[in-house]
């Protein structure tokens, strides 16, 4: 459900003295010393600030490392808070309530290499823009759908590790990762408008997690499994759709396959786009087809983006 989150704590004079006495007066050395202890446990201080005499520590938590497991749910909140409590008390001498300024939701799905390559190719044909969100796809194994306050992306986790020359953990092998990051401005908006506290417990709920993925990723990649035109046409022809609409639906799929989803929205009216998408949802066919001439491509790929799995 979650991967990482960033927090900060403000230190009073006594707490800063404790921090320096225990780890070092030189802040950079102190950070290195702390990270040497806590980095393997999933907690890393990335920087400190001093504004108007207030000293603040900013740190990132990798919840998979913190708890030693990948399936993290609201049932783990006590263990998460226990580890955060111990860390803060250790570096400041007492507990200070941390303020969350970013959280990264994740959905990891095991997909073989060939299908990961094909899926990343297909994701390039998704909409270029939806609302305030824009697609950025300059990288072969990563696609972003960003606005100022929320960043969504799809990437090949194993290939990302290789690119960074980092070790690949067992839970990262063959993984296609879907990720939605809520930035501080969005958390502040939720706090202001809905009185949602900026802490991990508030955001560690399955329904909220699903809502963010649907709103910020599913609108681009859509539901339904992936087919070649031959397989899709066969499924359409065997359906209960009106005969007059069957060939029109096939032509709609061909248009997206050839030109991408963005150009298809310019050719078809909103009425027909909604109509054809409704048909495709009923048939569980993704609007983006597997190219029939793609080398060694299968004729069917199950959609890995399944929030009910």
Regions found by a protein language model. Give the residues of each.
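Structured, helix-rich domain cores that form ligand/interaction pockets
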Residues: 1-259, 283-309
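Short, aromatic/basic-rich helix-turn unit that serves as a nucleic-acid recognition element
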Residues: 257-269
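Helix-turn-helix DNA-binding segment
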Residues: 273
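Residues in the recognition helix of alpha-helical DNA-binding motifs
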Residues: 276-279, 283
């Amino acid at each position: 459900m979650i991967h990482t989150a960033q927090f900060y704590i403000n230190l009073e004079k006594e707490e800063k003295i404790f921090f320096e006495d225990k780890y070092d007066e030189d802040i950079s050395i102190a950070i290195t010393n702390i990270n040497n202890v806590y980095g393997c446990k999933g907690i890393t201080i990335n920087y400190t600030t001093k504004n108007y005499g207030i000293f603040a520590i900013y740190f990132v938590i990798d919840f998979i490392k913190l708890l030693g497991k990948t399936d993290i749910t609201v049932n783990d909140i006590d263990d998460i808070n226990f580890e955060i409590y111990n860390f803060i008390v250790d570096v400041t001498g007492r507990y200070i309530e941390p303020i969350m300024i970013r959280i990264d939701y994740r959905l990891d799905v095991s997909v073989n290499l060939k299908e990961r390559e094909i899926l990343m190719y297909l994701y390039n044909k998704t909409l270029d823009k939806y609302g305030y969100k824009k697609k950025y796809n300059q990288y072969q194994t990563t696609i972003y759908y960003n606005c100022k306050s929320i960043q969504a992306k799809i990437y090949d986790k194993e290939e990302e590790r290789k690119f960074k020359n980092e070790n690949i953990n067992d839970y990262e092998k063959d993984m296609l990762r879907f990720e939605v990051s809520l930035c501080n401005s969005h958390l502040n908006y939720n706090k202001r408008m809905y009185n949602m506290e900026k802490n991990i417990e508030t955001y560690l709920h399955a329904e909220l997690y699903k809502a963010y993925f649907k709103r910020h990723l599913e609108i681009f990649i859509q539901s339904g499994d992936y087919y070649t035109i031959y397989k899709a046409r066969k499924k359409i022809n065997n359906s209960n759709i009106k005969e007059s609409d069957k060939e029109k639906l096939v032509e709609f799929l061909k248009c997206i396959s050839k030109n991408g989803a963005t150009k298809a929205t310019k050719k078809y009216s909103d009425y027909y786009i909604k109509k054809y998408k409704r048909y495709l949802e009923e048939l569980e066919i993704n609007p983006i087809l597997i190219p029939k001439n793609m080398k060694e491509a299968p004729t069917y790929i199950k959609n890995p983006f399944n929030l009910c799995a």
